[in-house]
Amino acid sequence: MWRLKIAEGGNNPYIYSTNNFVGRQTWEFDPEAGTPEERAQVEEARENFWRDRFLIKPSSDLLWRFQFLSEKKFKQRIPQVKVQDGEEITREIATTALRRSVHLVSALQASDGHWCAENSGPMFFVPPMVFSLYITGHLNAVFSAEHCKEILRYIYCHPNEDGGWGLHIEGHSAMFSTVLNYNWLGKLGEGRDGGKDNACERARRRILDHGSATAISSWGKTWLAILGVYEWDGCNPMPPEFWAFPTFFPIHPARMLCYCRLTYMAMSYLYGKKFVGPITPLILQLREEIYNEPYDQINWSRMRHLCAKEDNYYAHTLTQIILWDAIYMLGEPLLKRWPFNKLREKALKITMDHIHYEDENSQYITIGSVEKPLLMLACWHEDPNGDAFKKHLARIPDYVWLGEDGIKIQSFGSQVWDTSFVLQALIASNLPSETGPTLEKGHNFIKNSQVTQNPSGDFRRMFRHISKGSWTFSDKDHGWQVSDCTAESLKCCLLFSMMPPELVGEKMGPQRMYDAVNVIISLQSKNGGCSAWEPAGAGSWMEWLNPVEFLADLVIEHEYVECTSSSLQALVLFKKLYPEHRRKEIEIFILNAVRFTEEIQQPDGSWYGNWGICFLSGTWFGLKGLAAAGKTYYNCTAVRKGVEFLLQTQRDDGGWGESYLSCPKKIYVPLEGNRSNLVQTALAMMGLILGGQGERDPTPLHRAAKLLINSQTELGDFPQQELSGCFMRNCMLHYSEYRDIFPTWALAEYCKLFPLPSKND
């Protein structure tokens, strides 16, 4: 039986930590673990997911919940409540529903103080990890038979009915995901016509019917070339020479978004080496299966710009095509000849130096799951027996996550992000006697997770930004600062500093708060908005060079309403508690952040959410930031418009429901069938509370609260519904803890807002 381990490094000599592994979460299989009842519970969850896999695509993330609740012997002892039609919500009903949720959420806290959760959903995260381990000969050493069993379960749980796999688990079938997943099925021993429900045969038919693997998008072409089932001649150039250019070069990688930069850092190294894994009989077999013509007769050069229409969200511009063709036809032939080949050798060394730097400063976790297998392969190519590769292997478990739908690869983990929101929800519940120990442990986790050093050495020369004082999205070892994660964590520390230390522990020292403020201020742009990881500033024209057909706005840093709102909230609260620290700078920051928030509001009153779905999420952030700055329905047009947007989109059942299609289409798209989503309902409900709706007409809030209360399960949680996260416009993420965080938080704010009638009144 699988067990989730918390804050453990194991006995591996190639793994190390900056904070004794606080926040680390790894799955291990123990054949002796579990009672017959516990094993039956897990099997039932798996069977239920399989039965309903086309109805609710995200998992409910039940396996670790079963484990934690069993270990803590949790029983929900507060009776379930419902609001009948025509019945008024009473103080007892609302408070009871809130307490039931708070008790459950508290029981789900990990031993080190954080909350675990799946953070996955894209269907292209697993294959590269399998490919890299297959190429390096470590597949069976890293993934046991039990791992492979659960990885296969995941792939069989998430195909579409046409046999393909989507970019993410709710998406239409994409050539990129379908080809990659078909290929890794072979690595795990599934034959040409094998797989559950004829998965391999159905996937292959879909690939061939839609143009074959030659129509895979550029990232797919790169991985297939690395694997040996595609030729590098069919890839557009990714010259490592860009890393050798001076930083004033207009398209130098230093100007790129960190995720784009690190992805192409590794890809350019492998491209420059024309790296190809071992050509095994399986590779030769795959070459015969995924193309409509014989492999040795394909004109690879003509395939470089080919991309299946279902993958082509961001079509390549003429400028890109001309640039790539020039490098392909003129630059690449030159760089293979003396003396220009010396430049390539130098560029490859520079690139590898950057790879080692990034690896070491993330404790070999790396920045994310797209980059991890590429960077690991580069290290293996340089030295298959080197310590760098062994340190990479030691951190693969950090990405592995298990649900009732099987094993998937996470983006990298959302430990800090989720925990900061859970803690704010618990603080808002105003139940100190019931949450004190939970809050203290969570407070300690936040304090232990703050990054306390900048990247090593001359980090500016390595194109890195300050990180001292920041918080990451996942854990301290990850190392990558994020503005909104820093702001939300700082808010927690500030709120805890206002509470009795005997209840929540000693407050964090002022200097560490000053360091956090320094990071936040450094990430505000001239337009008042805040970027996520590094200061924005590159020209927007660089997005014309976006090489990734299925994503958008990923070449450079941008400013986001979420980052701006979180940063604004944190600095407003900080200013109240530390009024003299950088007072003038913070006042200017707040004014500019408010201006940015107002300026980017959509004509219909909403805000586009970049990291959530979509306008409902963005509008909550927009209203929350403005409210923190003292803006109200009566003194701010933007608040009034935001409130009107929420009122106009409320459903008949009192809830809200928005489709993930809003993200790529950039217009509000409701869920099909007039459905409501509880996470979105909670966000919209809190947005209305922030906009003062309770003072004018609380009816919409009562209707929303009724839906949340009546949707609460017997256990005290809320049912899993659609995906709730997004990145780069077109790919969705599963934040499994959101289903409890936001309904709990909304009920807490609702109970604080109203002097609800008692049933005894």
UniProtKB/Swiss-Prot annotation:
CDD domains: SQCY_1. Its EC number is 5.4.99.41. The keyword Protein biosynthesis does not apply. PFTB repeats lie at residues 148-189, 639-680. Pathway: Terpene metabolism. Belongs to the terpene cyclase/mutase family. This is Lupeol synthase. The keyword tRNA processing does not apply. It catalyses: (S)-2,3-epoxysqualene = lupeol. GO terms for biological process: triterpenoid biosynthetic process. It holds the Pfam family SQHop_cyclase_N. Keywords: Isomerase, Repeat.
